[in-house]
């Protein structure tokens, strides 16, 4: 209403339009707020609720588009309110992606967040004397940045970080708030993500090239014939998240209709493992999610557990060494108070309450289980007993790293980096800080050949445990196994990796002569080093007839700067549970 106009002066149809809009707006807020109370596990418990929420927001969005003029004049609809609705829809798609692992929903979230910025929905917020509205804008920027990071839109991330920095500076100058340090921390966390890769790839004009490390079609070695923390998102979790996803279809080329927030066509369905991401969980939280994942696991599927945390070592000696006597990984720190009471100092024979011991995973070996442990006590998980005869494999990180090539926790774990991008990890381990685009492409092409050879080594070995072959039929697990073997071979040839504790291990143990110490694989690693001109970082085994001189003409020298990694600090517990299955998740209709 405007001026002296009363409600009775408004035509009945327009009054009904405002009433219907208010109803949809209230209903959408009610449903959206209810999402936080839903458990993250159990499809049946949350999928229908998400469907209802999507439906109401779709109606609300279309309704405000169709009746914008009436809502502007009669309701006083402001552009930031439209932006808030669009932001909520973006959040819906992002959280649906987290629950389903369907990367196409990231594109949907990006389309809404992008349109908010393009149409300056939050532009007028800075002119309002209401700090809570500015906070809405800052939170929008933070969410938009997370989505862009997951889509590897690094150039846009840098622009958004600059804009967010300016917005935070303006916000803290205008309002005397207590959350200034919190927002500055957000900026620092984003900057750490942007600078996390220890090696950059450069074009001819010295501009940085950004690559996605999600699985591409044809990027996994073929099977042989007849074979069956930004926003609590740490860099290691970010890398494993992408290692367990396929590249979204038409990610770079998808266009959007003019004047609408809807894409031209619905995103194509892709098969990705359903994942749960846990940051510093308590043992009870971790066990709850493990149990839910185990219960939901379809037939012919496997549960993957990725653990990245500080190692907990046994405090005393026991005559009987069982599955709880080798320590494990610490799931949560600073847990000195239990049920309101301060914990007394533990007896040496007592176990750490918030340690995940190998024995804690025994109940879940009733179904196929694939475990990755990145920790200073990873080898505790070699002490498994396959009680139920189901396929079981554990890939275990080095326990220690050489002092001069230490794993820098701020930039993530070297072991996880190998599972995410072997070429990035290899280049970093050998001291490279930058690589030219042409050389990078040739090295990646060479690695594809290496992966095929590793795949043949595994599938043709007569002494390998059958568990590896049973998991080798899945594309994601096959790629992880191949990268693990390459990592093990590369570390064994590096001059500074000399302790046995500095090498990755596995349960069951891989036949070394057929895989990680194969002369063919060793030759491939040395060839890659020659290609990158980092021969000085590796040693040729005395048993291998290999001449560096033969390769120098094949791979000419390329000048490059060097970078050594800094000291690693203690890890904070990160857990990723993934259900590797070919079962599709039904698509929500918009």
Give a label for each model feature:
Residues 1-69:
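N-terminal alpha-helical scaffolding segments that mark the starts
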Residues 35-53, 94-109, 150-157, 419:
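Short coil/turn connectors between adjacent alpha-helices in alpha-solenoid helical repeat scaffolds
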Residues 108-225, 385, 441, 449-493, ...:
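Cytosolic small-GTPase signaling regions in large eukaryotic proteins
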Residues 206-353, 372-375:
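A domain-level signal for caspase-like cysteine endopeptidase catalytic cores
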């Amino acid at each position: 209403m405007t001026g002296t106009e009363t409600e009775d002066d408004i035509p009945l149809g327009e009054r009904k339009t405002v009433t219907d809009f208010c109803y949809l707006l209230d209903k959408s807020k009610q449903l959206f707020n209810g999402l936080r109370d839903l458990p993250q596990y159990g499809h049946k418990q949350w999928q229908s609720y998400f469907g209802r929420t999507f439906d109401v927001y779709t109606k609300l969005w279309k309704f405000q588009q169709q009746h914008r003029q009436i809502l502007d004049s009669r309701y006083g609809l402001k552009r930031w309110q439209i932006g808030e609705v669009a932001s909520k829809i973006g959040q819906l798609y992002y959280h649906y992606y987290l629950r389903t692992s369907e990367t196409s929903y990231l594109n949907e979230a990006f389309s809404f967040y992008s349109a908010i910025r393009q149409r300056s929905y939050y532009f007028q917020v800075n002119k309002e004397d209401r700090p809570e509205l500015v906070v809405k804008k800052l939170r929008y920027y933070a969410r938009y940045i997370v989505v862009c990071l997951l889509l590897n839109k690094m150039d846009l991330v840098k622009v958004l970080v600059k804009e967010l920095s300016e917005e935070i500076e303006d916000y803290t100058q205008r309002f005397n708030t207590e959350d200034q340090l919190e927002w500055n921390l957000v900026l620092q966390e984003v900057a750490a993500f942007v600078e996390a890769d220890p090696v950059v790839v450069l074009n001819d004009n010295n501009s940085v090239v950004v690559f996605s490390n999600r699985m591409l079609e044809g990027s996994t070695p073929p099977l042989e014939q007849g074979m069956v923390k930004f926003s609590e998102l740490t860099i290691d979790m970010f890398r494993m998240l992408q290692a367990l996803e396929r590249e979204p279809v038409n990610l770079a080329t998808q266009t959007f209709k003019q004047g609408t927030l809807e894409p031209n066509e619905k995103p194509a369905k892709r098969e990705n493992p359903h994942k749960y991401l846990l940051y510093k969980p308590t043992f009870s939280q971790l066990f709850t999610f493990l149990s839910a994942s185990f219960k939901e696991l379809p037939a012919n599927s496997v549960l993957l557990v990725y653990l990245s945390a500080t190692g907990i070592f046994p405090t005393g000696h026991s005559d009987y060494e069982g599955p709880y006597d080798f320590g494990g990984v610490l799931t949560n720190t600073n847990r000195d108070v239990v049920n309101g009471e301060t914990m007394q100092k533990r007896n040496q024979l007592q176990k750490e309450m918030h340690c995940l011991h190998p024995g804690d995973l025994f109940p879940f070996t009733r179904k196929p289980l694939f475990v990755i442990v990145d920790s200073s006590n990873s080898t505790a998980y070699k002490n498994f007993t396959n009680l139920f005869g189901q396929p079981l494999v554990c890939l275990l990180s080095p326990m220690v790293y050489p002092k001069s090539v230490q794993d820098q926790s701020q930039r993530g774990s070297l072991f996880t980096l190998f599972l995410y991008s072997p070429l990035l990890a290899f280049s970093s381990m050998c001291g490279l800080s930058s690589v030219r685009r042409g050389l990078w492409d040739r090295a990646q092409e060479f690695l594809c050949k290496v992966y095929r050879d590793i795949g043949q080594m595994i599938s043709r070995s007569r002494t390998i445990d059958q568990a590896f072959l049973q998991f080798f039929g899945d594309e994601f697990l096959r790629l992880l196994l191949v990268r693990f073997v390459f990592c093990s071979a590369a570390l064994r040839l590096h001059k500074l990796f000399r302790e046995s504790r500095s090498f990755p291990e596995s349960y069951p143990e891989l036949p070394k002569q057929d895989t990680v110490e194969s002369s063919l694989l060793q030759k491939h690693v040395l060839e890659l080093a020659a290609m990158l001109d980092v021969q000085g970082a590796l040693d040729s085994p005395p048993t291998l007839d290999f001449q560096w001189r033969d390769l120098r003409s094949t791979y000419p020298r390329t000048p490059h700067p060097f970078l050594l990694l800094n000291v690693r600090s203690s890890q904070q517990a990160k857990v990723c549970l993934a259900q590797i299955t070919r079962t599709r998740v039904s698509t929500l209709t918009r």
